[in-house]
């Protein structure tokens, strides 16, 4: 793609588009049209998602109202109780939460959430933002279904500056009130394909949705551009031995919902998928290129050699990446995620500062070209050299990441 085309894609998607929203659908249709313009067959695959509209959310701490946003899908009601801040969720601090509203660092995660409920917590306050940022933004969070696991509790999110004030003031009581309307909505994956000469496929994935505060240029329209660059480069050599399927995943930021929906709906077809190549955040001018491999260890060495022969530096390692490669690996498909991480101070995600200004069009194209070269090598292989098996260590990491074990 030309640099002008890359910049135009960033401009055309320069707005917040959260999972399940009308704005997400607008971006999905745009990506579909981009794929079709490159000569690929493309379509949308919808899937259901839990949605909620917050009608009212209030947090009163020691008689003073604190700006907040209610957690979507946490239920409706009011709770008033003593307030406690806990810096960890271990057996020591959990003794202090019974009958109390709990202020915590970080988000509500499955085991920590249920540990606090079992210890008697009656409500939750989380926070985000940064003490050093000039804004007082508050992210719109949700109580994810796989976190709640059927047990809803009122929760609100506040800004980091107010969280610090609450702790410094040694606040004693809190009152949370949330009123919401919950309903089932629809997100969708955008799927495009370039058939090969065999009945086996390589699936490339990248999510296109954003969090509520972010326009998502870096996280992750950059990854979508990486897929489009790969599509653009490989279409001229088609058909390759392996077919190429491009999946632009919806609702990744809500818990990998798009890739989970895709792998569940195509479970039988995944037997013919030899590799998943996921792209999540590339194109920043500073920072190292990484490859997280959820497959056999020898693939790490192969990627290093492949990159080194092209003068390309890469930090390759095995593990489970917090992105759309994970559901593929969990379904037995060898998977890897490519990314270019920013050094500290060079960019932030999941906030208002994730804009196209973070990105270099030239670096986006260079990163995309490397991913395309790697994919082309694999697509033209007589036999995909990666064993179609997931090592036990990766399986264990998947169980932990997906909340099946601690």
Positions of predicted regions on the chain:
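Acidic, glycine-rich active-site loops and adjacent beta-strand->loop/helix elements
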Residues: 107-108, 130-131, 182, 208-210, ...
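His/Asp/Glu-rich mid-to-C-terminal helical/loop segments that flank catalytic regions of hydrolases
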Residues: 232, 345-406
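Structural recognition of the beta-strand scaffold that forms the well-ordered cores
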Residues: 101-103, 123-126, 155-157, 191, ...
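N-terminal capping segment at the start of a domain
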Residues: 1-23, 38, 132-137, 142-144, ...
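Second-shell loop/turn segments in exported
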Residues: 14-22, 70, 103-106, 151-153, ...
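Metal-dependent peptidase/peptidase-like ectodomains
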Residues: 199, 239, 249-348
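Noncatalytic luminal/extracellular "stalk/propeptide" segments of secretory-pathway proteins
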Residues: 3-98
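Soluble metallo-hydrolase cores and metallopeptidase-like ectodomains found primarily
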Residues: 62-91, 139-217, 229-237, 241-243
